[in-house]
Amino acid sequence: GVAASLVMTALGSRVTPETVYWLWGLALLFSLFRIRWMCFAYAAGALGVLQTAASVADGQALERLPDVLARIVHSLQSAHMPSVLALVAVMHLAEEALIRFHGTGLAMPIFVEGKRGKVVGGYQLQGYWPVPLLLLVPASAGALPEGGFALEWPPLFGGGVDAWAWLAFPAMIGFAEQTTAFLPKRKARRTSARLAAYGAVLLAAAAAAEYVPWLALPAACLSVLLHEGLVLWSRLEESASPPRYVHGPTGLMVLGVIPGSPAEALGITAGQTIVRVNGVRVAVKEDLHRALRQNPAYVKLELADENGEIRFMQRALYAGEHHQLGIILAPDEDVSYIVERAERPLAGYVWMKLAGLLRRLPPRAESGKAQRAGNAQGS
């Protein structure tokens, strides 16, 4: 938030409180259909279209409109689209940095249905961060107090503004990706690199719209189209790549390791293949269990990394440690659940959370009967 605020301070901004209301209102409206549409990239695109439509109304037309409707149209007309698009670009650059440094730690192993109906392993990378921003805006912007202060430098989006003030802008950034073809670290790097390119292109489009006003609408549409292009690119890339987390002829594929387990202490990582355990070649999960039972106090492993290079690991085993060393294997046909790939609206996610909470709570009637029965037995 601090870094993004500093960048926006250097650029300047003509975002008014009314524009903030429009962005959040449109984002919440779109989230009713799909949660990922809550991203401000879509709200900025819609705002650009609405502003273009509202700009048709001149002063005489506004006078003939009802007061409330006239205020709405005026708030759309006063939205400074280059500043809005620059804000969206900077937020995606901040998202890129967060994914680059924290994306791998947010990865969670999952089982999903593959292209041919076979269950395969994968990773869900998902993270959300609240980002409080302080925007440098004209001091006369809407509900802001008059006065303000002058700047020692000419901001990019502040031509003709003499006095400035601060505007608090609460924002939320996040991402969600699924991969069955790449290691979590590589997927996070690919996602962050594409977001960096998106932010740079959108920032350049915002700067162009500042000096060529008619470019504001194409730049707003570009905000949506490029964002959808990134989503489509990721899905096509996954669809065209073979699944990585499946068992092969050489051994058992490691999907992940449990933190604090013997597997983590040994240095086992996702994407490695277990070839031999205690000298026994393993092809199915039962082979691994039998090989571990041969020597409950010590284990010797032979693993192949993603390049096919063989690595040898060994370690003493102690009572109470995970029976499978804490290794999460890629799924076989005997799985009890899979993660369904589906895009839900915000209300769907809220309902899922509430339904899960209600399932964990005991029914009132039964809990009351149990309590009365316990009291009767005690007496």
Question: Across the structure, where does each feature detected by a protein language model lie?
Answer:
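Hydrophobic core segments of alpha-helical transmembrane domains in multi-pass membrane proteins
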Residues: T19-A27, A44, V84-M91, W166-P170, ...
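Membrane-helix interface "capping/anchor" motifs
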Residues: F30-A43, Q178-R190
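Generic multipass alpha-helical transmembrane bundles of integral membrane proteins
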Residues: A53-P184
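Interdomain regulatory linker/hinge segments that flank or connect interaction modules
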Residues: L151-F157, G174-E237
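PDZ/PDZ-like groove recognition
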Residues: L232-A265
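PDZ-domain C-terminal substructure recognizer with occasional recognition of PDZ-binding tails
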Residues: E238, D287-E333
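Conserved PDZ fold ligand-binding element
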Residues: A263-K285
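Long, low-complexity intrinsically disordered regions
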Residues: L325-S379
